[in-house]
Swiss-Prot record:
Signal peptide: none
EC class of the enzyme, as a word: hydrolase
Residues that coordinate or bind Fe cation: C91, H133, H137
Disulfide cross-links: none
Alphabetical GO biological process terms: co-translational protein modification; translation
Pfam families: Pep_deformylase (PF01327)
Species this protein is from: Yersinia enterocolitica serotype O:8 / biotype 1B (strain NCTC 13174 / 8081)
InterPro entries referenced in this protein's UniProt entry, alphabetically: Peptide_deformylase (IPR023635), Peptide_deformylase_sf (IPR036821)
Co-factor(s): Fe(2+)
Active site per UniProt: E134
Catalytic activity, as annotated: N-terminal N-formyl-L-methionyl-[peptide] + H2O = N-terminal L-methionyl-[peptide] + formate
Cofactor note: Binds 1 Fe(2+) ion.
Protein name: Peptide deformylase
One Gene Ontology molecular-function label: metal ion binding
Length: 170
């Protein structure tokens, strides 16, 4: 397994729409494993393939405290959503920035697992929020897209400043 490079906003590759996975095979499973390795290394709770410049409908999630409840969603489909909630969300592609984003409180999805087997899942709370956040990535949407243009511009400026400082340090 290897740690992949996470794309950072405003990189336009984050806006690409992911294609469905045609066949779950060894290559797809390797991508899934590398995505988990990357997510854990970056201390995230979810990662969409788009964020590592792989434009396929693959999501990995682990919201557990012990980091031992891996969830793989290949070709996920939202079947139902209900209620309203929101927390301050962060994103590995938008480092050190957080914002309150409105989300459905509960979701029901259908997807394929790491072995290509179909399943349905009902989720609520943090898991439901994480699923919605990662599914947004698959259609080129970021949490900053829910914010006002002014807030979005501020975040962009902060990230550009951070990138310049990091470039000088290296």
């Amino acid at each position: 397994m290897s740690v992949l490079q996470v794309l950072h906003y405003p990189d336009e590759r984050l806006r690409k729409i992911a294609a469905p996975v045609k066949e779950v095979n060894g290559e797809i499973q390797r991508i899934v494993d590398d995505m988990f390795e990357t997510m854990y290394a970056e201390e995230g709770i979810g990662l969409a393939a788009t964020q590592v410049d792989v434009h396929l409908q693959i999501i990995v999630i682990d919201v557990s405290e012990n980091r031992d409840q891996r969830l793989v969603l290949i070709n996920p489909e939202l079947l139902e959503k209900s209620g309203e909630t929101g927390i301050e969300e962060g994103c590995l592609s938008i480092p050190e920035q957080r914002a309150l984003v409105p989300r459905a409180e509960k979701v029901k999805i259908r997807a394929l697992d790491r072995d290509g087997k179909p399943f349905e899942l009902e989720a609520d709370d943090l898991l439901a929020i994480c699923i919605q956040h990662e599914m947004d990535h698959l259609v080129g949407k970021l949490f900053v897209d829910y914010l006002s243009p002014l807030k979005r511009q501020r975040i962009r400026q902060k990230l550009e400043k951070m990138a310049k400082l990091n470039a000088r340090a290296n």
